[in-house]
């Protein structure tokens, strides 16, 4: 019975470790929620007999005469020009050294130590040293360029626009997703209804994909199993 219990315990342990190695680590998307917004219907206009209708909804379908048409309401669109170029480097080093030395002796050896040292003079010397050197460095560089048209999904109290958008590109058996969200100041929108991504606050840019190309970049279950077991 004890042998069977030990055998069962060993098999159960290996099974748990195997499931741990097969565990998939999900990635949290940067842009969460809906990636589009629908215009909110305005109030029904009431005709007052004048050429200019003061109650006319200027939010949708309104073209100003003396200014460019710019997004200002939920459902309006604008184009984000992606111009991200980020590079960073870091290096560090540390050195530590410590040396110690101790000498002592005695002319008369205690009786309980005569078997070890004899009756002669005894000298004891101890020395030690410890040295540590450490260096580390890291470099990162990322470049992202392109365009993406987004939709205004929220108008903030101060007039800024919260935008969100997504572009999906299917190539053969894989699909690429480009998602974007952020806060745009209407003053930074150009006459061509574009704004660079470097002028968007709280920008979230995500470029992911699925398919066999993306799966080839993931570590296999057997590799994850041995990686979890390895002490290195």
Swiss-Prot record:
<keyword id="KW-0975">Bacterial flagellum</keyword>
<dbReference type="GO" id="GO:0009279">
    <property type="term" value="C:cell outer membrane"/>
</dbReference>
<keyword id="KW-0564">Palmitate</keyword>
<dbReference type="GO" id="GO:0003774">
    <property type="term" value="F:cytoskeletal motor activity"/>
</dbReference>
<feature type="lipid moiety-binding region" description="N-palmitoyl cysteine">
    <location>
        <position position="22"/>
    </location>
</feature>
<keyword id="KW-0998">Cell outer membrane</keyword>
<keyword id="KW-0449">Lipoprotein</keyword>
<dbReference type="GO" id="GO:0009427">
    <property type="term" value="C:bacterial-type flagellum basal body, distal rod, L ring"/>
</dbReference>
<keyword id="KW-0732">Signal</keyword>
<comment type="similarity">
    <text>Belongs to the FlgH family.</text>
</comment>
<dbReference type="Pfam" id="PF02107">
    <property type="entry name" value="FlgH"/>
</dbReference>
<dbReference type="GO" id="GO:0071973">
    <property type="term" value="P:bacterial-type flagellum-dependent cell motility"/>
</dbReference>
<dbReference type="InterPro" id="IPR000527">
    <property type="entry name" value="Flag_Lring"/>
</dbReference>
<dbReference type="GO" id="GO:0006970">
    <property type="term" value="P:response to osmotic stress"/>
</dbReference>
<feature type="lipid moiety-binding region" description="S-diacylglycerol cysteine">
    <location>
        <position position="22"/>
    </location>
</feature>
<feature type="signal peptide">
    <location>
        <begin position="1"/>
        <end position="21"/>
    </location>
</feature>
<comment type="function">
    <text>Assembles around the rod to form the L-ring and probably protects the motor/basal body from shearing forces during rotation.</text>
</comment>
<protein>
    <recommendedName>
        <fullName>Flagellar L-ring protein</fullName>
    </recommendedName>
</protein>
<comment type="subunit">
    <text>The basal body constitutes a major portion of the flagellar organelle and consists of four rings (L,P,S, and M) mounted on a central rod.</text>
</comment>
<keyword id="KW-0472">Membrane</keyword>
